[in-house]
Amino acid sequence: MLEGIIRDSMTKQATKTLRREGYLIANIYGKGLENVAAAFKKNEFIKFLRNKETLAFDVKLGGNVLKVVVKEYQKCPLTSELLHVDLMVAQAGVRTSYSIPVKAVGTAKGLKNKGLLMVHTRRIPVKSTIENLPNEIVLDVTNLDTGDNILIRDIQFPANVDCYLDPRVPVVGVIKAK
């Protein structure tokens, strides 16, 4: 479980001080809940996110435990350092928008014919409850030849998970290398 602190002051100076001390600024929000300004140790947060197994994870703030999902993050354009993260509270039984990562598995046939595997869509936006949400969408690309694509309409989503992308959007494909 990831532990953080609730920020008391919202001034620019207080934010700079927290960042200098190694904290990551966060905003936690949810449907029907009051926004919470928080801060997490940056290194702990990054290590925790790399090792988590599900989209939703628990954070502890001032004695309260919240189940949250990373909704958005900001990086410094020069150093690519993580500056800010928005966390949304994942409430049971409430349909919300999430972005599910795509994972391509296998070696495509087209790669033997000097093709390149292109992942066009790294995350697929869906609407679902947190209970029905898959951790990732695994696509088997072994049968893809040069010029073949896997489209949104080719993916079998779990029950009660609705994708709101156009069905003709390519997710993974093999293109001919030049």
From Swiss-Prot:
GO molecular function, one term: 5S rRNA binding
First and last residue of the signal peptide: none
Gene Ontology BP annotations: translation
Record Pfam families: Ribosomal_L25p, Ribosomal_TL5_C
CDD domains noted in UniProt: Ribosomal_L25_TL5_CTC
UniProt keyword terms in alphabetical order: Ribonucleoprotein, Ribosomal protein, RNA-binding, rRNA-binding
InterPro entries for this protein: Rbsml_bL25/Gln-tRNA_synth_N, Ribosomal_bL25/Gln-tRNA_synth, Ribosomal_bL25_b-dom, Ribosomal_bL25_C, Ribosomal_bL25_long, Ribosomal_L25_dom, Ribosomal_uL5_bac-type
Gene Ontology annotations for the cellular component aspect, listed alphabetically: cytosolic large ribosomal subunit
Complex and partners: Part of the 50S ribosomal subunit; part of the 5S rRNA/L5/L18/L25 subcomplex. Contacts the 5S rRNA. Binds to the 5S rRNA independently of L5 and L18.
Protein role: This is one of the proteins that binds to the 5S RNA in the ribosome where it forms part of the central protuberance.
Recorded family membership: Belongs to the bacterial ribosomal protein bL25 family. CTC subfamily.
Protein name: Large ribosomal subunit protein bL25
Gene from which the chain derives: rplY
